[in-house]
């Protein structure tokens, strides 16, 4: 992967599809691509391969690193509602923005404009806020609590296996929490 200051380092870009209800990792991918814009299609493919077992996904929630018109189109073609942040959001928007609906969407809006409008609605903001309590804790706990900060192996195939094992370990840890309490 290219790094700042010139040169290249052997780096990997790990992705995880996380179920919003259970916080279980349901799909993983790993690449050597430096940014996330090209990672929506591979994770959608992984999710669609699991659809028969897990049920079809309905919404894709992602941060600004995934935002592109192509990703919005890919989501809509896969019958998913995309909620991909277009830009950083203000932490303290004015009260009139927080509690009022935006003006109606124009009839000839592009898919990107429709998604941007959806993100400004009260329901869209509430749904997007779920990302902060779904996928962010997964990566935070994997890094901080489980102590996984770098891969031990080299080579895309081996590192993909290592990433799958890390996600499996997270799922086992999470299933212990989700398990009904006995006694």
Regions found by a protein language model. Name each.
Residues 1-183:
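Anion-binding and metal-coordination hotspots
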């Amino acid at each position: 992967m290219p790094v700042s200051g010139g040169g290249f380092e052997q780096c990997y870009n790990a992705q995880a599809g996380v179920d919003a209800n259970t916080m279980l990792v349901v799909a993983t991918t790993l690449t050597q691509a430096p940014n996330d814009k090209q990672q929506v299609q591979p994770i959608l493919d992984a999710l669609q391969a699991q659809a028969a077992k897990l049920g079809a996904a309905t919404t894709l929630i992602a941060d600004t690193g995934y935002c592109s018109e192509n990703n919005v189109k890919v989501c809509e073609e896969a019958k998913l509602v995309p909620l991909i942040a277009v830009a950083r959001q203000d932490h303290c928007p004015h009260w009139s923005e927080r509690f009022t609906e935006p003006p109606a969407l124009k009839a000839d809006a592009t898919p990107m404009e429709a998604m941007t409008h959806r993100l400004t609605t009260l329901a869209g903001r509430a749904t997007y806020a779920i990302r902060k309590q779904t996928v962010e804790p997964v990566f935070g706990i994997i890094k901080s609590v489980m102590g996984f900060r770098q891969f031990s192996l080299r080579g895309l195939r081996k590192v993909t296996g290592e990433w799958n094992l890390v996600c499996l370990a997270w799922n086992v840890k999470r299933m212990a929490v989700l398990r009904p309490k006995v006694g």
